[in-house]
Amino acid sequence: MTQRRKFFKDSLKASLGLALFSSVSTNVRAESSAAKKSPYTISLAEWSLREWLNSGKITNLDFPETTKKVFDIHAVEYVSSFFKGKETDSGYLRELKSRSDGAGVRNVLIMVDMWGQDGALASPEERIRHAAAQNHHKWVDAAKYLGCHAIRVNASGYGDASYRDAMGYFADGLAKLVEYGAANQISIIVENHGGYSSNGRWLADVIRQVGNEYCGTLPDFGNFRTDLEGGNFYDPYIGTAELMPYAKGVSAKSMGFDHHGQDTTIDFKRMMNIVAAFNFEGFVGIEWGGGLGMPMDAEAAIKATKKLLLESI
């Protein structure tokens, strides 16, 4: 099957899936998950332990073993900044892989954050988009060595471009990078991560334009803020449903908990019903995003998120 034909099928699946999402109650699963093995594997996003990493309590090399020992989670999602510039150091990567393999922990993906011109995949200037795609190649190489299936990138650099223009710029820059990813069998996935990318329809349209099986999304439950200064939000449930047809992972972000152990911003059960409606199978990554003023440390928050996620599946 050609990649283009596959994406036509994905687009049809998107339309059918959204119809299903609209017609099925978001409070009750159409099919009991208790009757079959869960199609999900829980992973942990490294950003959840940013305080431990920034304070020196642990390092990037310690992350896999810490994840297993402290949280009984056996899959990890790295963040580029915690490599501290060692992403091309073969000795460092070898040590990281040795430690993750030794702990029996799966390396899932690397979240790559290059916010300046070096990572501007959506720049209005073609030469900058081209350079940005090449600047991401080292992360594809690192992901491949570590045994990850993907890197996550951002839709950045479009500045004041219009909705349509920014879409075209990013689709072009992303396609350049996806070509390299596909050649190395590493998927390039995009998270809703602010600005236009937090508009589910916009990001889904970008993925359709790229039209490559190695290009997809990483829907994040909590990142649907389209305007940081204005505080504008895209509906997270609609946005997640729009991104799920192209999902190669799911980011279950938590921000705080009430006295019943429920997230204070997102209905996890409703979100996981949406994920299930699209027959997703793969990694669901826990990401502790904050606390909204609640006195909860990272360890307690991650464990609370894991408990809530397991109850919601």
List each model region and its residues:
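Short, acidic/polar
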Residues: N54-K69, A131-D141, N232-T240
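N-terminal secretory signal peptides and thylakoid transit peptides that target proteins
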Residues: M1-A19
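Acidic/histidine-rich catalytic cores of soluble enzymes
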Residues: D10, A75-V76, D165, A171-N273
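C-terminal helical cap(s) of enzyme catalytic domains, especially alpha/beta-barrels
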Residues: D297-I313
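C-terminal segment of N-terminal export signals and the immediately downstream linker at the start
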Residues: S23-L53
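Structural motif
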Residues: V70-F71, L146, P245, F278
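Conserved, mostly hydrophobic/aromatic
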Residues: L44, T67, S100, A132, ...
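Structural motif corresponding to the early beta-alpha repeats
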Residues: I73-A175, A182-S187, N223, G256-H260, ...
